Amino acid sequence: MTELKRVLGFGNILGLAIASIMGTGMFFGTAVGASYSGNASILSWVLLSIVAVYISTFFGELVAMFPRAGGVYEFSKQTYNRFTSFMIGWLAWLVGNLTTALLIVAAIDYLIPDPSQYIIKMIISVILIIILNIIAFHGIEASGFIVTVLAILSISIILSVIFPGIFFMDLSNLTPFFAFGTVPVFITMFFIAESFFGWESVTYLSEETVNPEKIIPKALVYGTMIVGILATILAVVSLGIAPYQDLIVTPAPLSLVFEHIYGAFGQILNYGVFIALIGSAAGGIITMPRLILALARDKLFISQLSDIHPRYKTPYKAIIFQAAISLIVFGMAFGRYRTLLSLLLPLGLIMYIFIILTIPILRKKYPDIKRSFKVPFVKIGPYLVVGFLFSLMVLWIVTEPNAWQILKLGLSFVSIGIPIYLLLEIYYDPDFIVKVNDSLAYFTLLTEKIILPKPVRKEILTLLGNIRNKTLLEFGCSVGTLTLDLAENVKPGGRVYATDLSEKDLMITHNRMTKRGHRHIIIIHDEHQVNRVHPDIPPVDAIVSIGMMGYLQDVKKVLREMKELVPYGGKIVFVDYVDFFKMIPNVAWLSNDATIEKLFREAGFSVFVTRKKGLFWNYVFVYGIKSQRDIPYV
């Protein structure tokens, strides 16, 4: 199996850490913060920088313990249950997409401040997203190099303000300092917190980093310190050069500062800010597919997205998927910087609260695991930070008029993950499959004509041919929809062995057969059907199975056992559901006809594969005969 390639060193990871953590706050945060607390926002930057450096140590310890591509999902998996870890992974993915959209919106606003140039701004943004994803597709070396260069450029832009800007400061602009009082200082910290979002992005590259246990923790801490120091000094210089009353009404705040320092030439530096923000967006575009990869590996996302490109060693399917999602999210969020920021912040803080709490839990759960990097003050520190972040959210809800509505909107996006999780578990988890089938047994009965319509049943019977007086195995009979047809067609001397995972499905099937007097139908409950054919099944003339291929955990074993039951030339007909709602595929091997044919051929069957369109999903038909040779079957 193709694996990710370890090529990233400390310089690449540090550059990525700076680019990912920096966010839009470095370039918009001074004005956003000043709009809430005036010059006292400087104090917000100082306090938040200290907290941010401490939070970076949590990610450092976690990646030192679990240096895997899943990052926050992997940490949650080791700490919480399967559902919670998926939801945190889903939340991290939402936060990542919102962050990328926010960065690109901010970048375009610096490049083209005129809001009337909507079409041009949209076209440039789409082209940029596509280019960045193409770079990510073609290898982590090129991606890492570009992000590192852009991080250096970002620092250069900030330094081009700080050092000459010191000599243009008017200290009278910094007074009065507490023009709005002290409470707004904490509200400000909520709104500039995005300036330090992004630690999780670096952890997604653990499997592509040389010696990640040591390199990534150091890069996270150093990167956060660099961003914190630069952001704080930039805020001091900006507020010293331009009164906060002017900054807060400027669409691109640093442009005003550039103009004070460099005059008309300062407008050129807007292009530098644009490139720097795109560099931060690139960090998310490069790293987020690794989160999808980790979820797909654990069958908590579409399994096909875990594939690694044999040449470029990148999760190319996840990158393509992520590119499409990025374009959709950007299209929905275009031109709404303040709304995006308000939506992103509470979701990000909720995610970080869950991640911070993993440290004290894992210290107790795995006390002996090797930790090359440790969080200081672990007995009280995590709880103080969680309390601090939670209090910022409460303060935001209390003071901002629309905060509660925005939070509910954000949580509604998070809640979409619940049905997705249930759907994925139905696909992949045998125990969950049984529970769901049992709970939905009567619903399945009510909707059987939709789930298995008459034309599909007729096609199956046609493929089976003449089954009069034959013995059949129906592998997965559900509520007996097809069983009723089989029962009539094998008369007068035939039999049908109907097996299923669900006891409730079988109870319904039994009642239906009894009501119609079909005593030649033998019903067998098999809770292990995803891994075997029930041992009580005798030799049969043919095998038919509906909707079971996607559930099989050991396909080859089940097919080999079926081969032993049918005579040479004995027929098999398998039908399964794919492309649910025309967009959600089934398990990976059912997506490729050649793979299906190969699996059946290796088990001793010569089969033909066809696909037919349905209303809510499509059908894949696999039919053929037991054969020692790979002969065409018609």
Stretch-by-stretch model annotation:
Residues 1-29, 36-40, 53-57, 69:
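Membrane-interface "cap" regions at the ends of multi-pass membrane proteins
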Residues 1, 74-79, 103-124, 157, ...:
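Helix-loop-helix connectors at the membrane interface of multi-pass transporters/channels
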Residues 74-75, 81, 113-116, 189, ...:
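TM-loop-TM module centered on a large, flexible mid-protein loop between adjacent transmembrane helices
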Residues 108, 121-168, 179-182, 220-225, ...:
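Membrane-interface loop-to-helix entry segments
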Residues 32-36, 44, 53-129, 133-137, ...:
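Hydrophobic transmembrane alpha-helices that form the core helical bundles
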Residues 3-4, 39-42, 115-120, 148-271:
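Helix-loop-helix junctions that connect adjacent transmembrane segments
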Residues 146, 305-312, 352-402:
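C-terminal membrane-solvent junction of multi-pass transporters and transport-like membrane proteins
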Residues 379-435:
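A generic transmembrane alpha-helix motif of multi-pass inner-membrane proteins
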